Curated annotation (Swiss-Prot):
CDD domains documented for this protein: RNAP_beta'_C, RNAP_beta'_N
Gene3D superfamilies for this protein: 1.10.132.30, 1.10.150.390, 1.10.1790.20, 1.10.40.90, 2.40.40.20, 2.40.50.100, RNA polymerase II, clamp domain, RNA polymerase Rpb1, domain 3
Source species of the chain: Pediococcus pentosaceus (strain ATCC 25745 / CCUG 21536 / LMG 10740 / 183-1w)
Name this protein carries in UniProt: DNA-directed RNA polymerase subunit beta'
Binding positions (Zn(2+) 2): 818, 892, 899, 902
Function recorded in the entry: DNA-dependent RNA polymerase catalyzes the transcription of DNA into RNA using the four ribonucleoside triphosphates as substrates.
Annotated family: Belongs to the RNA polymerase beta' chain family.
GO terms under biological process: DNA-templated transcription
Bias (Basic and acidic residues): 1202-1212
NCBIfam families: rpoC_TIGR
Length: 1212
C-alpha cells in the first residue's frame, strides 16, 4: 500500500484501453456471480477468485493450500493465488467488448465533449451512436462530405451508386474512427486563426472548442479514449453479495448492471461468430451500448433501467453523487472507532473542563487501556485474561478504570455542529447511571439543553492527539466566540437570576446603614439575621487590600450591599470592586461617589441616594470579557465556575416563584381599547366617504392597534414592581422579554394571517383573562407558521453554511506578513441616521496600514503595521478620527490564504492569529451559524409609496453571496458628475434622471414610484445609487474598482446581521467576499498561451504574466469577475474539492479531459485522500521541526580567571 502522507498531488485522466487491461487481473467472461448451492464464486464470473483473489485469508478455492506459509503461491488445481482476502477490495477485472462503445459522460454532458472535438451537434452524435444514421468517415472520390449523416436508405443507395469508393460507419466504431482522424494540432491552429476575426455565437463556440482541444493536447489524453473497447470491472468487495436469513441474497445494483453488459456482450460475440444478419447485429450493438450507459450513469439518457419494484438501479455515477455518495458519505466523514453516544444531563457540580462519563461507557471506551494496565499491574496474566476480567466486571477492574481515565481528555460533539465550538475536549469524571453529564456553562456553545438531547463522545488515542485535545480544545479555552470575540460561556437562566437577586438593593431593609469592619463580620451579621442580602451597608475600604482602590478611597467607607460584598468575593484578586453595573465601574475602578468620609452620617446619605440597579446578564458577560482580557484563560474559567455555583446557590435561596397573582391587571386597559375602537371607526368613515384608499385605511387601522398595544405595554412597565418575580426574570435577562409580558397582562395584539399579511382583527384579551374561541383560532395561524418557518430556516441556513465552508475551506493563515502596500480605508457603517456598525468595532484587533494622527494636535496615536487594541481603539474614537486605513483580507497578497497582519486578531483568543489557523472555515461558520436566527421573510415596505419590497434576513444574505440579481434593484450612475434634471412623465409612469459627467451625459429612466436618493444639483460619483434599493454588484464592478465592490458587499452583509442584533467581525465577511472575487476573465492573451475568455485564478494569472514579462513578452489583460459562492466553489483549482461539493459527474468529466492535477492545498482534498490536514499543527512548517544543537559541547569546565582573561582580550 502507498502511504498517503508521501504523495504531493493527485492527477486524474482518461484511461486508455491498454491501461484498463493493465489494471485488470483477468477477464470476466460469464454473468454468473456465485453458485447458490455451494456458495462459492463461479469460475470466470463476476466474483471469480482466480481474478479477484481468495475469499478467505491465505486459502485457495479448492483448499489445497491453507495457512500463511504458502503466501504468494498460485494453486495448480484451482488457479487461485494464496494471499490476504483484502485484495478483493483492490483487484480489478475487465470485460472485452465485442464492439466499441462510447462513454456516456463525454457524449452527454453539457457541453458535449465529443461534440466539441468533432464539431458535430449532440443530436447528430446521438443518431450515430444509437444506430439511427450512418456517418461518412472517408468520402474518397465521391461528392459526399466527411462527417455527413446518411439514413439507412440513403446509405444503401450510395453504396449501390459508389460501391467501396467511400467509407461510412455507424455506432461507437464510427465515433471511434472519427476521433482517431482528428488532428488536434491542426484544429487548434485553425481555431486560433478563426478567433482573430470571429464574433458573437461563432466566437463563443470557437473558444469552447479550442479550450477542449488544447486540454487534450496539454494533458496527453487521446480523444479516441472517450470510446471504450474494454470496460473495467470494479473489485467484488466494493459491490458485495450477501446472504440474508432465509437463503435469499442481497446484491449491489452494480452486479445487475454488469450482468446485463456481459450477457449482451456474449450474445453479440455469438451473433458475430454465426455471421448473423446486419440488422440483428446492429440491434445487439445498440443494446450493448445502452447496457454500458446504464452501468456508467443510469438514467442519464432515456428511461433508467429498473430493478425489482420499479426502482431505478444505482450506477457507478450514483455511487459518487450526493449526500449518500462515496465522497460525502465515506470520504469526507467516516464513522470512527472509540466513540459512543448517550443522552446528556446537567452536571452542576462539575468544573469547567470536566464532563461526567457513565461507568459502562467508560469501560467500553477505555477497554484496551484497562487491559494493558491490568496486565501491567500483574492483575491478569495475559491480554485474554484481562478481557475476561472486564467482561466479568471484576472489582479490581474499577480501581484500574479510575486511574486509566485520569489525564485522558475526551471529545464531546453535539449535532448539528454549526461552529467549531460544537466539538470540545473535557476531562472525564466517572458518574453512575447511563447519561453523560455536561457542564451547564458549556451548553450555550453547543446550543444544548437537557430535554433529551444526545451527544457523541470520542476518545483521542495517540499522545499527540491527547496533547492537542488538552492544549487546544479543552472547554476552558473556549471562552470567547470566534465570530465576534465576545464571551460565549455566559451564565444563563438560574445563574443569572441568582446573581441578579444577590446584587439587588432594597431601601429600608433590616439593618440598613450598619457599618462593618470586613467581609467576615458581614457574613456573621447575615447568618444571625441582623442584615438581609439586599441591605445597604458601609464597609471599611482598607479591609479589602487586594482591591485596586485609590489611596484616598482606602481611608474612606464604601457604601455597598451585603449581596455585592458576596459577589465581589468571587472575583479574581486585584480586580475592581463592582458596585454598579456600569462600564465606568468595570474599566476605570469604583467611582468616588460610593465612598463616605469617616464621620459623615451614613443613614442620611442613604436616604438621599437612589437605588443602584442589580447586575443583569449583559453586565455579567462584560465582567467575564474584562477578566479574560486581564487574567486570560485559567483565572476566567475558575471565575465562571464560582459565578455558576454562586448563581445556583443564591437563586435557590431566593425562592422566586411565579403565580397568577404576579400578573397584574391594568385598570386603564378598557379605556385605551375603547379609544382605539373609536379611531378605527373614524378611519372607516373616511374610507366610506372616499377620502382615503383601501390601502391607506388598512395601514392606519394596523397603526392604531399597534399604538394601543404599545401604550398598554408602556403603562404596564411603569406599574411593575421591581420585586415582581416575572419582572425580575425578564429584567435580569434570565428568561422572557417585555412582549411575553404584554401578552400575559396587557393584550396579545395583531396576528398574521396564513398568507403573511397582518389581520386587522386584534386579539384584545391577554392570557391572564383568557382568549375567546375566535381569538384562540386566530392565534393558531401564527404558531403553525412559526413552526414551519423554523424548520425551513434550519435547512436553508445549513445549506448556506455548507456552501460557505466549501468556498473558503482552503483559506489558511500561510505567512507572517505578505508585504502588501495596499490597505482598506474604513469608516463607520451607517444607514441614514441609524448606526449599523461603529468604527470602534471595525478597527479593533486589526493592523494599521498607515499611521493614525489625532486631528486636533497632529500627534501620532499609532504607527503603521501595528495592532489596534481596545485602549488604542478607544483613543482613536475619542480623538474624533472618522476614517482609518487598515490591513485587510481584501488587499492581502498571500496566495491560497491570508497573512497574520492582514487578518489581525484571532477573535477566539484575543491574541494575534497564528500561522496555520484555518480562518476560512472559521469565517464560514461564523457567518453560517447565526443564519438560523435570521428571518426568512421579505419585509414589505407596503404603503402608498409603492416601493419594491426589500429583501432581508436569510434570503438577502443568499442573494449577496450567490451574487444574484437583487430584488428591488437600485439604478447606479456610470459617470461622475452633477444631476442636471429629474423629469417626471406621469403618462408613462416614469421619471428620467440626467447626469452630466465630464465627458458625456447619461440619462436613466426609473419608475415614477421609485424613492430617490439624489436630488437635482447633487454631485455624485460613478457607482452611486440613484434610488433606494440594492445595487447589483455585477453592475457595480463594471463602473468601479474591485475594492469598492468588496466594500459595498461587506456593508450589505453587515447590515442584515446587525439589524437582527447579531454581531459578526468584519474579517470573516471579508474572507468570504474575497473568495467570490478570486477569479478574472482574460480579455486579451497578449504573448501568454492563455485562451481569451478563460476564467482564471488571480494568482495563476499573475504568475503567467510574470513569466511572460520576464521573457520580454506582452502580458495578458483581464477583468475581475464576481462569482456566487456555489460557482466559486465549483471553479476551485482542486477537482476533488469541487467534485465532493456539487455536480460531481460534470466536475470529474472536465477534470479527466484536462488531466487535472490536484495540488492538495485545501482541507477537503486532504481529508478525502486521508492525508494529514495542512492547517493548524498539520502545517508542514510545524511538522518538519528538528531539534537543533545550540551550543558546542563543553569538554572540561574552565576556571573563572581564564574566562575573565579572554573577555578582557576581546574588549581590548
Amino acid at each position: 500500500m502507498i502511504d498517503v502522507n508521501k504523495f504531493e498531488s493527485m492527477q486524474i485522466g482518461l484511461a486508455s484501453p491498454d491501461k484498463i487491461r493493465m489494471w485488470s487481473y483477468g477477464e470476466v467472461k460469464k454473468p454468473e456471480t456465485i453458485n447458490y448451492r455451494t456458495l462459492k464464486p463461479e469460475k470466470d464470473g463476476l466474483f471469480d477468485e482466480r481474478i479477484f483473489g481468495p475469499t478467505k485469508d491465505y486459502e485457495c478455492a479448492c483448499g489445497k493450500y491453507k495457512r500463511i506459509r504458502y503466501k504468494g503461491i498460485v494453486c495448480d488445481r484451482c488457479g487461485v493465488e494464496v494471499t490476504k482476502s483484502k485484495v478483493r477490495r483492490e483487484r480489478m477485472g475487465h470485460i472485452e467488448l465485442a464492439a466499441p462503445v462510447t462513454h456516456i459522460w463525454y457524449f452527454k454532458g453539457i457541453p458535449s465533449r465529443m461534440g466539441l472535438v468533432l464539431d458535430m451537434s449532440p443530436r447528430s452524435l446521438e443518431e450515430i451512436i444509437y444506430f439511427a444514421s450512418y456517418v461518412v468517415i472517408d468520402a474518397g472520390e465521391t461528392p459526399l462530405e466527411k462527417k455527413q449523416l446518411l439514413t439507412e436508405r440513403e446509405y444503401r443507395n450510395k453504396l449501390s451508386e459508389y460501391g467501396d469508393k467511400f467509407v461510412a460507419k455507424i455506432g461507437g466504431e464510427a465515433i471511434q474512427a472519427l476521433l482517431e482522424t482528428v488532428d488536434l494540432e491542426k484544429e487548434a491552429n485553425q481555431l486560433k486563426e478563426e478567433l482573430k476575426e470571429a464574433s458573437g455565437q461563432k466566437r463563443t463556440r470557437a473558444v469552447r472548442r479550442l479550450d477542449i482541444i488544447e486540454a487534450f493536447l496539454k494533458s496527453g489524453n487521446h480523444p479516441e479514449w472517450m470510446v471504450l473497447d474494454a470496460i473495467p470491472v470494479i473489485p467484488p468487495d466494493l459491490r458485495p453479495m450477501v446472504q440474508l436469513d432465509g437463503g435469499r441474497f442481497a446484491t449491489s445494483d452494480l452486479n445487475d448492471l454488469y450482468r446485463r453488459v456481459i450477457n449482451r456482450n456474449n450474445r453479440l460475440k455469438r451473433l458475430l461468430d454465426l455471421n448473423a444478419p446486419g440488422i440483428i447485429v446492429q440491434n445487439e450493438k445498440r443494446m450493448l451500448q445502452e447496457a454500458v450507459d446504464a452501468l456508467i450513469d443510469n438514467g442519464r439518457r432515456g428511461r433508467p433501467v429498473a430493478g425489482p419494484g420499479n426502482r431505478p438501479l444505482k450506477s457507478l455515477s450514483h455511487m459518487l453523487k450526493g449526500k449518500q455518495g462515496r465522497f460525502r458519505q465515506n470520504l469526507l466523514g467516516k464513522r470512527v472507532d472509540y466513540s459512543g453516544r448517550s443522552v446528556i444531563d446537567v452536571g452542576p457540580s462539575l468544573k469547567m473542563n470536566q464532563m461526567g462519563l457513565p461507568v459502562p461507557m467508560a469501560m467500553e471506551l477505555f477497554k484496551p487501556f484497562i487491559m494493558k494496565e491490568l496486565v501491567g499491574r500483574g492483575l491478569a496474566s495475559n491480554i485474554k485474561n484481562a478481557k475476561r476480567k472486564i467482561d466479568r466486571k471484576d472489582d479490581d477492574v474499577y480501581d484500574v478504570l479510575e486511574d486509566v481515565i485520569k489525564e485522558h481528555p475526551v471529545l464531546l460533539n453535539r449535532a448539528p455542529t454549526l461552529h467549531r465550538l460544537g466539538i470540545q475536549a473535557f476531562e472525564p469524571v466517572l458518574v453512575s447511571g447511563k447519561a453523560m453529564r455536561l457542564h451547564p456553562l458549556a451548553c450555550e456553545a453547543y446550543n444544548a439543553d437537557f430535554d433529551g438531547d444526545q451527544m457523541a463522545i470520542h476518545l483521542p488515542l495517540s499522545n499527540e492527539a491527547q496533547a492537542e485535545a488538552r492544549l487546544l480544545m479543552l472547554a476552558a479555552h473556549h471562552i470567547l466566540a470566534p465570530k465576534d470575540g465576545k464571551p460565549v460561556v455566559t451564565p444563563s437562566q438560574d445563574m443569572v437570576i441568582g446573581n441578579y437577586w444577590l446584587t439587588m438593593e432594597r431601601a429600608e431593609s433590616v439593618g440598613e446603614g450598619m457599618i462593618f469592619n470586613d467581609l467576615d463580620e458581614v457574613r456573621l451579621a447575615l447568618q444571625n439575621g441582623y442584615v438581609s442580602i439586599h441591605t445597604r451597608i458601609g464597609v471599611r475600604a482598607n479591609s479589602m487590600p487586594e482591591k485596586p482602590f485609590t489611596d484616598a478611597q482606602r481611608k474612606q467607607i464604601l457604601i455597598t450591599t451585603v449581596g455585592k460584598m458576596l459577589f465581589n468575593d468571587i472575583l479574581p484578586k486585584g480586580f475592581v470592586y463592582l458596585n454598579a453595573p456600569t462600564n465606568e465601574n468595570l474599566v476605570s475602578g469604583t467611582p468616588d461617589e460610593y465612598f463616605l468620609e469617616s464621620g459623615e452620617d451614613i443613614r442620611e446619605q442613604l436616604n438621599q441616594r437612589p437605588l443602584i440597579a442589580p447586575f443583569k446578564s449583559g453586565f455579567l458577560s462584560d465582567v467575564i470579557a474584562e477578566v479574560y482580557k486581564q487574567y486570560k484563560v485559567t483565572e476566567t474559567s475558575l471565575l465562571l465556575d464560582r459565578m455558576k455555583d454562586l448563581g445556583f446557590y443564591r437563586s435557590t435561596l431566593s425562592g422566586l416563584t411565579v403565580g397568577i397573582a404576579d400578573i397584574t391587571n391594568l385598570p386603564e386597559k378598557p379605556e385605551i381599547i375603547a379609544a382605539a375602537h373609536k379611531q378605527v371607526a373614524t378611519v372607516t368613515k373616511q374610507f366610506r366617504r372616499g377620502l382615503i384608499t383601501d390601502d391607506e385605511r388598512y395601514e392606519r387601522v394596523i397603526g392604531i392597534w399597534n399604538d394601543a398595544k404599545d401604550d398598554i405595554q408602556q403603562r404596564l412597565m411603569e406599574t411593575f414592581d421591581p420585586q415582581n418575580p416575572i419582572f425580575m426574570m425578564s429584567d435580569s435577562g434570565a428568561r422572557g422579554n417585555i412582549s411575553n409580558f404584554t401578552q400575559l397582562a396587557g393584550m396579545r395584539g395583531l396576528m398574521a394571517a396564513p398568507n403573511g399579511k397582518i389581520m386587522e382583527l386584534p386579539i384584545l384579551s391577554n392570557f391572564r383573562e383568557g382568549l375567546s374561541v375566535l381569538e384562540m383560532f386566530i392565534s393558531t395561524h401564527g404558531a403553525r407558521k412559526g413552526m414551519t418557518d423554523t424548520a425551513l430556516k434550519t435547512a436553508n441556513s445549513g445549506y448556506l453554511t455548507r456552501r460557505l465552508v466549501d468556498v473558503a475551506q482552503d483559506v489558511i493563515v500561510r505567512e507572517k506578513d505578505c508585504g502588501t502596500d495596499r490597505g482598506l480605508l474604513i469608516s463607520a457603517i451607517a444607514e441614514g441616521n441609524e448606526m449599523i456598525e461603529p468604527l470602534y468595532d471595525r478597527i479593533l484587533g486589526r493592523y494599521t496600514m498607515k499611521s493614525v494622527f489625532n486631528p486636533e494636535n497632529g500627534e501620532t496615536i499609532i504607527g503603521p503595521n501595528e495592532m489596534i487594541n481596545e485602549a488604542i481603539a478607544q483613543q482613536i474614537i475619542e480623538a474624533g478620527v472618522q476614517e482609518v486605513t487598515i490591513r485587510s483580507a481584501f488587499t492581502c497578497n498571500t496566495a491560497h490564504g491570508v497573512c497574520e497582519k492582514c487578518y489581525g486578531r484571532n477573535m477566539a483568543t484575543g491574541d494575534r492569529v497564528e500561522v496555520g489557523e484555518a480562518v476560512g472555515t472559521v469565517a464560514a461558520q461564523s457567518i453560517g451559524e447565526p443564519g438560523t436566527q435570521l428571518t426568512m421573510r421579505n419585509f414589505h415596505t407596503g404603503g402608498v409609496a409603492g416601493n419594491a419590497d426589500i429583501t432581508q434576513g436569510l434570503p438577502r444574505i443568499q442573494e449577496i453571496v450567490e451574487s444574484r440579481n437583487p430584488k428591488g434593484p437600485a439604478e447606479i450612475s456610470e459617470v461622475t458628475g452633477t444631476v442636471e434634471a429629474i423629469e417626471e412623465d406621469p403618462a408613462e409612469g416614469t421619471k428620467d434622471i440626467t447626469i452630466k459627467g465630464e465627458t458625456d451625459t447619461r440619462t436613466y429612466t426609473l419608475p415614477i414610484t421609485a424613492r430617490m436618493k439624489v436630488a437635482e444639483g447633487d454631485y455624485i460619483h460613478r457607482g452611486s445609487a440613484l434610488n433606494e434599493g440594492s445595487i447589483d454588484p455585477k453592475e457595480l464592478i463594471k463602473v468601479r474598482d474591485v475594492l469598492s465592490t468588496e466594500n459595498y458587499l461587506l456593508s450589505e452583509i453587515q447590515k442584515v446581521y446587525r439589524m437582527q442584533g447579531i454581531e459578526i467581525s468584519d474579517k470573516h465577511v471579508e474572507i468570504m467576499i474575497r473568495q467570490m472575487l478570486r477569479k478574472v476573465r482574460v480579455m486579451d492573451p497578449g504573448d501568454t498561451d492563455i485562451l481569451p475568455g478563460t476564467l482564471m485564478d488571480i494568482n495563476d494569472f499573475k504568475n503567467d504574466n510574470y513569466k511572460t514579462l520576464i521573457a520580454g513578452g506582452i502580458p495578458a489583460t483581464s477583468r475581475p469577475v464576481i462569482l456566487g459562492i456555489t460557482k466559486a466553489a465549483l471553479e476551485t483549482n482542486s477537482f476533488l474539492s469541487a467534485a465532493s461539493f456539487q455536480e460531481t459527474t460534470r466536475v470529474l468529466t472536465d477534470a479527466a479531459i484536462r488531466g487535472k492535477n490536484d495540488p492538495l492545498v485545501g482541507l477537503k482534498e486532504n481529508v478525502i485522500i486521508g492525508k494529514i490536514i495542512p492547517a493548524g499543527t498539520g502545517m508542514t512548517d510545524y511538522r518538519q521541526i528538528k531539534p537543533e544543537v545550540v551550543g558546542g559541547n563543553v569538554e572540561q569546565p574552565q576556571s573563572l580567571s581564564d574566562v575573565e582573561k579572554e573577555m578582557n582580550e576581546t574588549v581590548e
